[in-house]
Regions:
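Short, hydrophobic/aliphatic alpha-helical segments
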Residues: 1-7, 46-57, 88-107
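Short, cysteine/histidine-rich loop/knuckle motifs that typically chelate Zn2+
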Residues: 1-7, 14-17, 24-27
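Cysteine-cluster motifs in flexible loop/terminal segments that predominantly coordinate metals
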Residues: 6, 25, 32, 180-209
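Short metal-binding segments enriched for Cys and/or His
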Residues: 19-39
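Polybasic, low-complexity association/targeting segments
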Residues: 39-71
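Active-site-proximal helix-loop elements at catalytic-domain edges
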Residues: 59-89
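Conserved phosphate/anionic-ligand binding catalytic regions in large, soluble enzymes, centered on
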Residues: 66, 104-121
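A structural-propensity feature for long, helix-poor, extended segments
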Residues: 125-126, 131-174
Length: 209
């Protein structure tokens, strides 16, 4: 039973005291500030944009909101670099799909931040279950990201996996687009807030730079 809304559902995650908070309550109040910030953003670098969004007070250290943040940041960065699209329609569709991805998918489904990047690529290419030409692209992107995530290792960190997903997605997208997209190097400032931080094993840990 969710400790906030009191709805009952199956879960694999409770706190040390046995309390459970559902994904809807966990991310309540997150999506509107994120969407508002993205719509008004002019930042062209997707990693810098990701850091801005993750700095919003409504975004938690970990949580399912990152499944929507990754594809939304990718979409917004492309728009800001001149990629042609119907931005509002695409952003709405991305958020609708990403909110269906539950928390804990990194451990329970094995897809993590790659799921959001796959949603981004699916929307950008117009892919669907029966689309012959576009169908492979989201699959290939997700496989590239998952390989990188697995190489870095666990346990989960929504900040680390979001950054990796963004980096790999942009490198992948550059192969098929003439739009030039900048990609900075970033250092993590969240490691002290993450009890499971892998420290020197993380490519964004400050000591590694």
């Amino acid at each position: 039973t969710c400790s906030i809304c009191h709805k009952e559902q199956l879960t694999n995650t409770v706190c040390e005291n046995g309390h459970f908070v559902c994904d809807a309550c966990h991310s309540y109040g997150t999506y509107i500030p994120v969407s508002t910030a993205l719509r008004s953003s002019t930042e062209k670098d997707p990693l810098l944009l990701l850091e801005e969004i993750m700095d919003l007070p409504s975004v938690h250290m970990h949580g399912p909101e990152h499944h929507a943040i990754v594809p939304s940041v990718l979409l917004t960065a492309l728009r800001n670099n001149g990629e042609r699209m119907n931005y509002d329609t695409a952003l709405s569709e991305i958020c609708k799909r990403a909110r269906q991805v539950p928390g804990g998918t990194c451990g329970y489904w094995g897809v993590c931040g790659a799921a959001g990047a796959g949603i981004f690529m699916s929307v950008m290419t117009g892919s669907g279950p029966l689309h012959k030409d576009a169908w492979p692209f989201p699959q290939k992107l997700v496989s590239v990201i998952l390989s990188k995530l697995a190489d870095v290792g666990g346990p989960r960190c929504c900040k680390r996996t979001s950054r990796i997903a963004i980096e790999e997605a942009i490198r992948f997208y550059r192969q098929f687009s003439s739009v030039k997209i900048p990609l900075s190097s970033v250092l993590c400032k969240y490691f002290e807030d993450n009890k499971e931080c892998i420290r020197e094993d993380c490519p964004y840990y400050p000591v590694n730079k």
